[in-house]
Swiss-Prot record:
<keyword id="KW-0548">Nucleotidyltransferase</keyword>
<dbReference type="GO" id="GO:0032549">
    <property type="term" value="F:ribonucleoside binding"/>
</dbReference>
<keyword id="KW-0150">Chloroplast</keyword>
<dbReference type="InterPro" id="IPR010243">
    <property type="entry name" value="RNA_pol_bsu_bac"/>
</dbReference>
<dbReference type="InterPro" id="IPR037034">
    <property type="entry name" value="RNA_pol_Rpb2_2_sf"/>
</dbReference>
<dbReference type="InterPro" id="IPR007121">
    <property type="entry name" value="RNA_pol_bsu_CS"/>
</dbReference>
<dbReference type="InterPro" id="IPR042107">
    <property type="entry name" value="DNA-dir_RNA_pol_bsu_ext_1_sf"/>
</dbReference>
<dbReference type="GO" id="GO:0009507">
    <property type="term" value="C:chloroplast"/>
</dbReference>
<keyword id="KW-0804">Transcription</keyword>
<comment type="function">
    <text>DNA-dependent RNA polymerase catalyzes the transcription of DNA into RNA using the four ribonucleoside triphosphates as substrates.</text>
</comment>
<dbReference type="Pfam" id="PF04563">
    <property type="entry name" value="RNA_pol_Rpb2_1"/>
</dbReference>
<dbReference type="InterPro" id="IPR007641">
    <property type="entry name" value="RNA_pol_Rpb2_7"/>
</dbReference>
<keyword id="KW-0934">Plastid</keyword>
<dbReference type="Pfam" id="PF04561">
    <property type="entry name" value="RNA_pol_Rpb2_2"/>
</dbReference>
<dbReference type="InterPro" id="IPR007642">
    <property type="entry name" value="RNA_pol_Rpb2_2"/>
</dbReference>
<comment type="similarity">
    <text>Belongs to the RNA polymerase beta chain family.</text>
</comment>
<dbReference type="GO" id="GO:0003899">
    <property type="term" value="F:DNA-directed RNA polymerase activity"/>
</dbReference>
Amino acid sequence: MRLDENEGAFTIPEFGKIQFEGFCRFIDQGLMEELHNFPKIEDIDKEIEFRLFGNEYELAEPFIKERDAVYQSLTYYSELYVPARSIRRNSRKIQKQTVFLGNIPLMNSHGTFVVNGIYRVVVNQILISPGIYYRSELDHNRINYIYTGTLISDWGRRSKLEIDVGERIWARVSRKQKISIPVLLSAMGLNLEEILDNTRYPERFLFLLKKKGRWEREEYLWSREKAILEFYKKLYCISGDLVFSESLCKELQKKFFRKRCELGKIGRRNLNQKLNLDIPENEIFSLPQDVLAAVDYLIGVKFGMGTLDDIDHLRNRRIRSVADLLQNQFRLALGRLEDAVKRTIRRATKRRSTPQNLVTSTLLKNTFQDFFGSHPLSQFLDQTNPLTEIAHGRKLSHLGPGGLTGRTASFRTRDIHPSYYGRICPIDTSEGMNAGLVASLSIHAKIGDCGSLQSPFYKISERSREEHMVYLLPGEDEDEYYRIATGNSLALNQGIQEEQITPARYRQEFIVIAWEQIHFRSIFPFQYFSVGVSLIPFLEHNDANRALMGSNMQRQAVPLFRPEKCIAGTGLEGQAALDSGSVAIATQEGRIEYIDAVNITSSVNGDTVRTESVIYQRSNTNTCTHQKPQIHQGECVKKGQILADGATTVGGELSLGKNVLVAYMPWEGYNFEDAILISERLVYEDIYTSFHIVRYRIEICMTSQGPERITREIPHLDAHLLRHLDENGLVMLGSWIETGDVLVGKLTPQTIEESLCTPEGRLLQTIFGIEVSTARENCLRAPIGGRGRVIDVRWINRVDDSGDNAETVHVYISQKRKIQVGDKVSGRHGNKGIISIVLPRQDMPYLQNGIPVDMVLNPLGVPSRMNVGQIFECLPGLAGNPMNKHYRITPFDEKYEREASRKLVFPELYKASEQTANPWVFEPDHPGKHRLIDGRTGDVFEQPVTIGKAYMSKLSHQVDEKIHARSSGPYARVTQQPLRGKSKRGGQRIGEMEVWALEGFGVAYILQEMLTLKSDHIRTRNEVLGAIITGGPIPKPDTAPESFRLLIRELRSLALELNHAIISEKNFQIDREEV
């Protein structure tokens, strides 16, 4: 998207660019770097040498298409080949060969991966950058301050330096154990003279090393061996004497210094910059000079000569992108490969072997499979709509390995920091436990080389006042100490820029300052927000909490049967649709030769270019992905022109809902508490009808009794359930499936003994002498809510890692879901609600021209939620619909003048009333409101009502997937009460509050039924079914239910005996019985 301003033009970056850049960095740099670090391997006798030449690696072209990998449940990958050399020194024989190391999953054009047929995305992680950070905290008495310096390694491990109240310096090796700094420095190889020669504050250092008023020089003159022994005792909490040995020294080096003191290149750079050191960046481990400089700085902080760090500032954070995560896994795989080659090379001395024989290719494949299958940052891609895919790839997570958890993260970490300005969206985050821990990148932010977040600004020249765009890092001098004007205060009009004051950001504070003192300015009002928030028109009129809900609920909107683009938008809809990859684009200029539903063939300079369309493809969230051609045969197209629209695009613009006529008024209580009543027009005209594609799968395994069989001949099953199967036992294409119908007929072999275990098997064998079947039916049936049309059946046959033949059958069923009571709908401003009733259109309130409204919303949902943007949105929708106009409005239009949004809306309503000759569209007495007529009585409502065309979406929270009922089902073994949940065919548990509600109505018999024979009274529960069939009286329980018996047993386990008594109805005498 290109936006022109007075000073120039700029282009909004591609939304998926961050994922693409990260993966390209891994392929171009990460692979070569790790292969270059792969060591030379020799056997014990040094007769054979093995080496890889990583600079010449090759990635083969994938042998399978991405779409075929999805259908066949395969991984979309490329094969990695690396030249290798083995040398036999005895025979002086040199063998060179290009060896196959394994498979590397490839990123597709959407910035995602296909692993085992499932789309997955790798989420960027935001972590504390490795280095040292100084803070002050109160002691346990909350009186004095303790100054600490925390050294954070590249893997997130922490070591802490601290000055206590007694002014001693300690290094904390664990939560409970600490060691004095002289012992640590002595263990690292320094003596007291070297310490005092290299410190900036020798006097202060000696003063802080005092103990009880006297010098203990022998403590500071400890030998290295003695210091290592003392360090080892403190680290492992060992009492008693130890004997120094090299193995003890190596263990300390491996367990402590290698794990907690590995800084990495980024940590080394941060440490050099913080402590003013000049150590090469390839020195990735902490040195004694680092500890000494850190102690010096800590002393300076103690006496006011240093500055404390803000750990939440983005300059102290880094982004671990997909490149870093994949490179770590590749490093892990090469480490396993090194161990495997060392084991193999021992046996290779006795026989002839090639370099390929020394290498096993399964290690790399298994490592990446484990990463994509189980790593917290490799997530199941949310494909509800294209916006969801874009937003998922742009997430930033504080969670994951080396990060925080939802339970331990503080409020300060979750809060918005001023350094997020232009880099992380202050609105878009998760709701619930992860609020503030999963954020989203701003649309202009990009990730730098060191994992830092950058944001663009226009730099204003002091002399000529000309501007040019620069990217600022968080914490840079320009970002901290220069004044940056905010985008919501700038006008495109040059005259308004010369105003005296403007809001600006300076040193993490927001101030008001003269325009002449501004150094930088924002390039666009949208640059602080994420993609989802940037699609909300009139955003500035909404409370941030409701904007957050609106942004999240746009990602839950399902694709509709006939999508429609919004009348009032922000202008980013086209960019979002383009970058999502849901539309087909012409790659070159040419002429359309042939077009159908599947292929678009164009002629480009005499060559034929074929573009495949996506036809009724299932997404991860069971929504329908589909493309519709938008060009005609013989038409000439240009490069970049849209060839086919997606399921949620119209004319290349993202279209997640429908423009419907809404009225803000109460209606007989049916819109109480955000409920929504709708017209039957939305049902019968398929306004909110959506298609969903569900996949059911069944595996054909090899059992101990033989292979399972797919067949139509299923004994003891009603022929009606098998009516859709073909001769192979698979459901036929185009069949209409109801709940319980067999989709795939399967027989599992079993022994005769297993067959005779069933009662019917023994009965048939005894009475009739019939041979019992040696196979049991194990068919795939349509579950509850699985009705629909079969659109595809795929029988997948592949060989697994163990060499066995694995067969799977996938059945795809298309479901057409109309909107109904219980479905959830939402606008873009957090105005959500559940459908409470579907009214006949003649009963709906109607306009003065006789058009009935489509939805009635509760007006009380606007003032308390402070999302007035929905009112500003629906009024231009009302004006633009008859004039066939669409509005694209950037937020913060108040920068032009006060009440700019109102001054935009009312003139448009006036124009619409003039052009349509309907004066009621704009009534000066109450602009924006209209007189509505009750459809039931024909009377005019007493008060004028706000009506308009609002853009409402149907969300994925649909009643078909949530509602559940059962007449019979399983019970819990212990309590004998119904199980919980739809997936287990559970029932309703009558709990405490339900009992209170029934007691309030005095329904004693219903309450007794609910608590006994319908719940956990076993004997009566079994007798009820027979009583219902025979028409006899319902039996009454005369003993305690099972839950009460369970309570008695639990009390008995606590040595408490509880007896109960039953009073006779005849003589009111107590009849005691054992429970």
